[in-house]
């Protein structure tokens, strides 16, 4: 479908590409998930990526959501879980096809929930031998730019402009700075946190950890105190630290996806839905109102759906007939 599109007809690409052969999204031979390994997957992407470069306007961005893959020791023969650096492979793949690499946004994930899915970060195993333990696997948004026509100037052929009355100098200086200054406010104590439910507890702890000077020992002490009182959940991380860096997003709401509506309506849930938060931020930052935002792996049409709500036009391609039909219902 990308091959059918006109040259330079897309203003922004936002997509979550298949994670190699980690998932099989549809029972179709054409599914990108039906590949032997990473090398085979990227060989298939070699057919799509040049088309994405062709249809994108000069100077505009392709925002690629990816996640590293966990490799299990009993499969690889390593004996311990290791990590396949899928995001790094993605960087070099898109560079090889002519995109300029603009950087990477890190989206923090919950290590407790991750362990419940992969069993590679278990507390008991950590206590037996810490050397076999890595860290949680965040998600990444890789930012690639199609070179602008005039390489002597940095501007896109059609810039994404901001109105200075709404987007002030002060706001930009804060946005552009890598870290936020501390107000000196202290963290809440475990006793103060006990009165909140798990959801509100997590939000308050994250907000306060952004504004106060971080204290690792105090963070651990709060968690231990909550655990002694039976207040520390074992299925998700209730007191995750907040991020000061603009390129590390700690507040993505995992429940805000079209899968929530799918489940409520008794329809098939997507195996890997994009949260609204990620999509909205990318659309607002990298496109103008009225422009066309495209997702070549549209799934439930999250990207075109959010684009329309944000005053843009949306387009997407999807192999699964069921996902496609459900996506049309959201767009209707």
Q: What is the predicted role of each segment?
A:
Residues 45, 331-332:
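Conserved phosphoryl-transfer catalytic core
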């Amino acid at each position: 479908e990308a091959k059918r599109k006109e040259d330079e007809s897309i203003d922004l690409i936002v997509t979550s590409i298949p994670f190699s052969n980690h998932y099989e999204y549809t029972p179709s031979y054409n599914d990108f998930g039906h590949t032997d390994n990473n090398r085979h997957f990227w060989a298939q992407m070699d057919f799509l990526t040049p088309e994405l470069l062709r249809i994108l306007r000069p100077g505009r961005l392709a925002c690629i959501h990816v996640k590293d893959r966990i490799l299990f020791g009993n499969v690889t023969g390593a004996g311990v879980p290791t990590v396949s650096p899928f995001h790094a492979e993605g960087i070099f793949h898109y560079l090889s096809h002519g995109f300029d690499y603009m950087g990477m946004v890190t989206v923090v994930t919950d290590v407790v929930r991750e362990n419940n899915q992969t069993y590679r970060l278990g507390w008991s195993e950590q206590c037996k031998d810490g050397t076999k333990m890595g860290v949680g696997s965040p998600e990444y948004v890789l930012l690639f730019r199609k070179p602008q026509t005039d390489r002597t100037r940095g501007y896109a052929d059609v810039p994404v402009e901001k109105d200075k009355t709404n987007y002030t100098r002060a706001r930009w200086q804060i946005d552009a700075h890598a870290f936020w200054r501390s107000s000196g406010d202290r963290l809440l104590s475990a006793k103060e946190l006990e009165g909140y439910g798990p959801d509100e507890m997590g939000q308050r702890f994250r907000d306060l950890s952004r504004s106060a000077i971080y204290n690792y020992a105090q963070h651990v002490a709060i968690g231990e105190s909550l655990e002694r009182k039976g207040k520390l959940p074992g299925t998700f991380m209730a007191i995750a630290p907040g991020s000061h860096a603009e390129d590390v997003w700690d507040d993505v709401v995992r429940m805000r996806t079209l899968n929530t509506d799918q489940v409520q309506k008794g329809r098939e849930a997507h195996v890997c839905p994009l949260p609204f938060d990620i999509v909205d931020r990318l659309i607002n930052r990298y496109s103008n109102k009225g422009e066309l935002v495209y997702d070549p792996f549209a799934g439930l049409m999250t990207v075109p759906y959010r684009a329309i709500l944000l005053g843009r036009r949306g387009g997407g391609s999807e192999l699964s007939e069921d996902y496609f039909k459900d996506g049309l219902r959201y767009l209707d």
